[in-house]
A protein has these predicted regions:
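Conserved phosphate-binding loops in N-terminal lobes of ATP-dependent enzymes
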Residues: 28
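Conserved phosphate/oxyanion-binding catalytic-loop motifs
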Residues: 35
């Protein structure tokens, strides 16, 4: 969402119009963000205030995907979580026990990050804990520039503990599976708009989903030119305004 339909606290008016036109044409809309620092309720409220009028079941985060994996594949196992209080609350409300001595470590985008949190995560992973991460994004775009994201935090743990995490969210198959389950459509009938080559666009390229890059967020035209052919989007547009004009005139 961030960098595609809004940037920080600034809404893209053309995005509001585009989403409205999609719904009125009978198309299914799903807002998917890798930013797990906030829970889905936060995004519902934010999008409502911005004028998007999100409906039930239209918002999915990498935190949702991670929680679903833990509940389905690691039931009852405690987790050490490096995340915001909102993400901690989402985990506990989903029935996941948080512990400082767990056999599973999950790192995420944590704006309350401390050295103690990093040290604990590294020690646990170094001693054999399973290492998971909600999403691989290195930077989060804001109105004031980029700030370190989940991937940067995971890189710290990997450098210290020597273990690469299993990632969820975009661009991984677990995310696509949840998208298909929620929308009821197969990958052939889904199109993703996003601003990042290595998450949004990679989701499409790796999983048979049409991928359209918008230049309102992290990626520049130079980045696209420098990317390998297999990693380039199916289409590049300046913003969702271009998509709105192309589809609806």
């Amino acid at each position: 969402m961030d960098g595609t339909v809004f940037l920080g606290g600034r809404v893209f008016d053309f995005a509001v119009r585009f989403i409205k036109n999609l719904r009125e044409s009978g198309r299914r809309v799903l807002f998917f963000t890798n930013n797990a620092s906030h829970n889905p309720e936060y995004y519902y409220d934010k999008l409502r205030r911005m004028g998007f009028d999100p409906q039930d079941g239209e918002i999915l985060t990498s935190g949702d995907v991670t929680v679903e994996f833990l509940k389905s594949h690691r039931p009852g196992k405690p987790v050490y979580l490096v995340g915001t209080p909102e993400l901690e609350r989402q985990f506990t409300e989903s029935g996941i026990t948080l512990s400082d001595s767990a056999d599973i470590v999950v790192t995420s985008f944590d704006t309350t990050l401390t050295y103690k949190k990093l040290d604990t995560a590294c020690r646990l992973v170094r001693n054999g804990a399973e290492y998971l991460s909600t999403h691989p994004d290195f930077n989060c775009p804001t109105e004031d520039g980029f700030i370190p994201d989940s991937g940067a935090i995971a890189a710290f743990v990997t450098a210290s503990a020597g273990v690469t995490p299993t990632y969820f969210g975009k661009p991984y198959r677990t995310a696509v599976t949840m998208m298909c389950e929620i929308t009821g459509f197969p990958t052939d009938d889904i199109c993703i708009f996003g601003d990042r080559l290595y998450t949004d666009i990679a989701l499409g390229k790796k999983n048979g989903v049409t991928a359209i890059l918008v230049l309102t967020g992290e990626t520049t035209e130079n980045d696209v030119s420098a990317a390998a052919e297999a990693d380039r989007p199916d289409f590049v547009i300046n913003s969702l305004a271009d998509a709105d004009r192309a589809i609806f005139g």
